[in-house]
Amino acid sequence: MRPEGSLTYRVPERLRQGFCGVGRAAQALVCASAKEGTAFRMEAVQEGAAGVESEQAALGEEAVLLLDDIMAEVEVVAEEEGLVERREEAQRAQQAVPGPGPMTPESALEELLAVQVELEPVNAQARKAFSRQREKMERRRKPHLDRRGAVIQSVPGFWANVIANHPQMSALITDEDEDMLSYMVSLEVEEEKHPVHLCKIMLFFRSNPYFQNKVITKEYLVNITEYRASHSTPIEWYPDYEVEAYRRRHHNSSLNFFNWFSDHNFAGSNKIAEILCKDLWRNPLQYYKRMKPPEEGTETSGDSQLLS
């Protein structure tokens, strides 16, 4: 018999299977650990131990993610059942009261207020569910982004090529900008949603004749309509180039990559930030190679020619 005031929730079949999956993952993890321990003591092969430890870590991470999913779904099921019970109670209460006559503006506003009060916890539940889902997806994306970054390190000039080939960015880059970008080794973008939506752009450089910084960080506050400059790393120009940097910044007042790079608050610089955050970072490979225009008098084949 269930004590008065307690709640019991049904666990869907997919969740019971999920719990079994976590149990099997944990059991496999223990068995793998025991077997590897025996092999290590008998053969003293350090490399084998490292490989199994890596597999165990991956398996453990999958188990944690699965458990997070299960607990999140259980919480959602509980909240949904509680909401259904409250709605049914409200309907029974309304049926017990004689039907109302035409509503006056005052009574309509009172009813509207009551509906809005009921809607608030539903909105809060939706925000919580969305936040959990976003955090879960970010955890799943991270190992892929880390692997992508490691692979890009093996492609010389990858990011300089990507930026120069972008149809909007290419119009903002001069020959001097391209030479400066040739020293760029990596690009990273991080987004934070709480307490404010913030986009952080990090450009990594090897030693070059222009500036001393190894990392240039630019931060933007993001809202529905724009990217607004928030913070930027001051550029430490070398003395031999400082005068030239000043000349370039004041000689050309139009929007270009150098003015965005050297002056965080330059008018229109939010356009470049939006391109980097929303387009280049998400799929840079599509801009690494560009289409080669067909020569006159030749027919285009099914296989497109590409320029690196």
Curated annotation (Swiss-Prot):
GO molecular-function terms, A-Z: chromatin binding; histone binding
UniProt keywords, alphabetically: Cytoplasm, Developmental protein, Differentiation, Gonadal differentiation, Nucleus, Spermatogenesis
Location(s), subcellular: Cytoplasm; Nucleus
Chief place of localization: cytoplasm
GO CC annotations on file: chromatin; cytoplasm; nucleus
Superkingdom of origin: Eukaryota
Gene3D superfamilies for this protein: 1.20.5.1500, Nucleosome assembly protein
SUPFAM superfamilies hit by this protein: NAP-like
GO biological process, one term: spermatogenesis
InterPro entries tied to this protein: NAP-like_sf, NAP_family
Keyword Nucleus on entry: yes
Transmembrane segments: none
Family annotation (PANTHER family): TESTIS-SPECIFIC Y-ENCODED PROTEIN
Family: Belongs to the nucleosome assembly protein (NAP) family.
Functional summary from the UniProt entry: May be involved in sperm differentiation and proliferation.
Protein name, as recorded: Testis-specific Y-encoded protein 3
Organism: Homo sapiens (Human)
